Amino acid sequence: MITVGIDHGTSGIKVCIKNNDKTITTYFKMSRTELKNKSFLGELNKYENLRDIDLIAMGYSMGDGINEILPIEKVENRGVINIEGVGEKVGGGTKMYDEIKNSNIPTVVIPGLHKNIECIDARFRALYSHMASPEKISIAYCAYKTYGFNNFILSDISSNTVSLLIKDKKLFGGFDACIGAPGLLHGAIDLEMIRDIDSNKITANEAFSTAGVIKVVIDKYKGVENTKEEILKNYKTDEKCKLAIDTLILSVAMEINSLMFLNPDKNIVLAGSIATTKEYNLVDKLKEYIKGNIYILEGESGALGGALIAEDILNGKKDILGIPVNI
């Protein structure tokens, strides 16, 4: 059995190819710019014969146009209501999606976490129209399969920060990138930004795209693909870079703690490029603020989670953390 998981994130895509027959797992990445200028399937074919792939699992953008995991041929409008208000758009992900859809490779599309997902607690559905994009579902599934917890908080800390609560093996609720803790790039819109939006200095989407802790050190902004490396490069020598990361850690702790009273087993799983950057020492710093059991997912957990979802669907699983599978 060969399955492929695709994590379509802010800075590009990460791909996991899981070959159960040979017990081999292969990863590769493509930047958003690369994706726009190259054939995704041409790149995938370098690692695995396309005819041998049993199932691809992927998400697209916010995933708010579908409520269950569906075959790609049954998905309308790429599974989104529209693509406005979702951060900077390059076009590579759209090109990849259409290339896969036209290929006849068996593929399922994973929804995002939004108000029409029925396993979510009614109070979260009343509060928020959207809680997570599809790759966060894949990361949560990777955490579930890796650690086997029935109850846990997943906090994915990268260009944005999204924290999800899983209770009794089902998604219960969470905080999207534009609601709670900021990420490196994206974050909640505050008073100053509301004024800038109302005075037509910036759009709401532009505000969201730079409302993360990058606003502390905006001169280090190098676009969605290169800002992380720029911050890391200057972290030990630039006080503002250090302040940005320290601010991020504090806000993540606040977000996780706000969900802890609903998390009976006190298990927290961290993921994402900021969480796994050794220089930031995130786990030890978060332990100062959080009373719980903190674990970390190394590597490309979104891509691996997608491959695991595809594998379990082929093995007959009817739901993924409470989200129905309809194939």
From Swiss-Prot:
InterPro entries: ATPase_NBD, Methan_mark_12. Belongs to the UPF0285 family. NCBIfam families: methan_mark_12. This is UPF0285 protein Maeo_0978. It comes from Methanococcus aeolicus (strain ATCC BAA-1280 / DSM 17508 / OCM 812 / Nankai-3).
